[in-house]
Amino acid sequence: GIQDLHGIYQGEKLGLELEYFLDKHNPALAMLPAPFSREEVDTITEEQLTDKTRVKSLRQQLMKETVPLLLDGESEYLIVDFYDFHNYIFSYKDTAFGTQANEFCGTALGKKYKEELQAWNLFQLPTWVLYGMVDRFFDTIMQKFDADHIILNRFWTNAMMLFKDGKVGLIPEECKQPFQCHEKYNVNCFNLEQHIIDKYHPYVIDLSRYFIGDANIWDNWNASHFEREFYRETYDQIIRIITKQADEKYFDKVRFFDSSRPGYQEDKERKFDVEWGIQLFEQFVENNNDLWKNMLDKLLVYAP
């Protein structure tokens, strides 16, 4: 996949190299048989895709190359999230595969087999089946990466966005397609993550539940796109872990209420409706929603 990581990744400045960015590769599906032959998969070209950068990653996940790439590579650390579990997949004969944000459906190969494909979500499976599939991935991958070299980035789909008029509101339902994330799967994803944490003990970064979307930086509104500060905070912790500066294995603290954080001045340039924010802050506190910290931080930035 494309390796700019939302414009935040700067590991090369620290002597770090990103070997692979395996975009939308699903750990459970990675352990299943390839649905099509190499010759068929090779017919997929950039011209058939809306997002041309996804052609390589789409071919890789159709050929089930995820695990071989990781095992045969030179990477010392594996960073994984369960984002793709939110998105619908296809069953075909004795296997299943992801759609690469629906890109597969527009290919000649996707159109050829359209009538033979069944769309569904992995969270429809009983936990004993799904967890077993994911365990198989981790059991295999831990032949190379031990618990101190795997970083699980927990993923809590956001339901809200800061719009350009300064108000924070719900992301419109029409922006939540079956091939995109939806907050209805958050509890399922949280429980799956907790299972992996309890069983395999990786490093954990748990920050997404504190952030919302931002229409100032995302034209493509969907529930997996966050404020830029989320990416900064996440990558800062990844760097801390890899450079062995982290004492804890579970990180869930955000640098809110800190005017020295990198995005503070950038945040001040956005519009923010303070009165509306006060109402939301009170609602979040009343509902024990973790976003109360985010909203209080914004109130202190825009109305100190």
Where are these regions (language model features)?
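Substrate-gating cap/lid alpha-helix
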Residues: 160-206
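Well-ordered, non-membrane alpha-helical segments in soluble/globular domains
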Residues: 59-64, 123-139, 178-194, 228-235
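Surface-exposed cleft-lining segments at the edges of enzyme active sites
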Residues: 49-54, 104-137, 170-183, 222
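Short, solvent-exposed loop/turn segments at secondary-structure junctions
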Residues: 1-4, 83-87, 155-160, 209-213, ...
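Oxyanion-hole/transition-state-stabilizing segment in secreted/luminal serine hydrolases
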Residues: 48-124, 156-165
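Acidic carboxylate-rich catalytic motifs and surrounding loops in phosphoryl-/glycosyl-chemistry enzymes
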Residues: 154-156, 200-219, 249-258
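Histidine-centered active-site loop/cap adjacent to the catalytic His
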Residues: 218-270
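Serine-esterase "nucleophile elbow" of acetyl-processing enzymes
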Residues: 1-43
